[in-house]
Each structure stands twice: as structure tokens, then as C-alpha cells.
Amino acid sequence: MERILENAMYASRWLLAPIYFGLSLGLLALALKFFQEVVHVLPNVFALSEADLILVILSLIDMSLVGGLLVMVMISGYENFVSQLDIDESKEKLNWLGKMDSSSLKMKVAASIVAISSIHLLRVFMDAQNISTDYLMWYVIIHMTFVVSAFCMGYLDKLTKH
């Protein structure tokens, strides 16, 4: 009975595979939104103010960071929890493939969240004259919460590895 239960639990890791595949569909949706934004802004690029153009570029950077985060979580999560990726040796391989454990993945995710939050904060500051000070204060508090959390996670990770 114990053996059957253990085998069933071990096999249940495959339930994560469709979830990671679903993330790839999320990446596709993000790419479509990215190119929709590019196609939308290009005809009007000369009519945009510098500040508006910077806001659009920040949105594109934000989407690229989220896309990178999706790829990282999707691939390393699959490798860590489901199965090793069998990639042909003749194909290009990501240098971190097979090297990112769940601890380093958490740190990369935390760093990505801080970077994404920084871009959102910069976007908010660029429109600061139209935003209430309470909103700005809470945005900074939330961002600093992400920063402190990422720092604490890194510090705890360093403590547990030594």
C-alpha cells in the first residue's frame, strides 16, 4: 500500500506539466499584446510627447521583463518539479538550464518582481502631477515591501547555504 501511495504521489508531479504549458500560452498572449502596442504607437510616434513615448517604452520593457519571468518560471519549474528537458546537443541551450534550483528561482523571481515594480513606480512618478500624494505614498510603500522582501529572502538564502 505504501509503495502504491508513494508512486502515485511521485507521478502526480506530472499534473504541473499542463500548468507550465499554460504559462507558455500566457507568454503568447503577452507577445501579442506587446506587438499590438508597438503597432499602435508607431504611426503616432512623431505626435507623441517625449514623456508619453518614454511611458510607452517603459510599458514595453515591463512586458519584456514579465515575459522573461514567465520563461524562467516555466522552464526551471518544469525541470525542478516535473522532468529534465531533453534538448538536442546541436541546438542552442540556455546557460542556466539545469542549474537553477528552487531557491535560486525564488531569488530570480523576487529580483524580477522588484524590477517590474520599479518600472511601474517610474511610470507613476512620470505622471506624479496628476496623482494624489496618498497614492504615491502607497505605491512607494508597496515597492519598498518588494525590495525588503527580496533582500530578506537573499539574506536568508545566504544564511542557509553557509
UniProtKB/Swiss-Prot annotation:
<keyword id="KW-1003">Cell membrane</keyword>
<keyword id="KW-0812">Transmembrane</keyword>
<feature type="transmembrane region" description="Helical">
    <location>
        <begin position="53"/>
        <end position="75"/>
    </location>
</feature>
<dbReference type="InterPro" id="IPR005134">
    <property type="entry name" value="UPF0114"/>
</dbReference>
<dbReference type="Pfam" id="PF03350">
    <property type="entry name" value="UPF0114"/>
</dbReference>
<feature type="transmembrane region" description="Helical">
    <location>
        <begin position="10"/>
        <end position="32"/>
    </location>
</feature>
<dbReference type="GO" id="GO:0005886">
    <property type="term" value="C:plasma membrane"/>
</dbReference>
<feature type="transmembrane region" description="Helical">
    <location>
        <begin position="135"/>
        <end position="157"/>
    </location>
</feature>
<feature type="transmembrane region" description="Helical">
    <location>
        <begin position="109"/>
        <end position="126"/>
    </location>
</feature>
<keyword id="KW-0472">Membrane</keyword>
<comment type="similarity">
    <text>Belongs to the UPF0114 family.</text>
</comment>
<keyword id="KW-1133">Transmembrane helix</keyword>
<dbReference type="InterPro" id="IPR020761">
    <property type="entry name" value="UPF0114_bac"/>
</dbReference>
<protein>
    <recommendedName>
        <fullName>UPF0114 protein PP_0682</fullName>
    </recommendedName>
</protein>
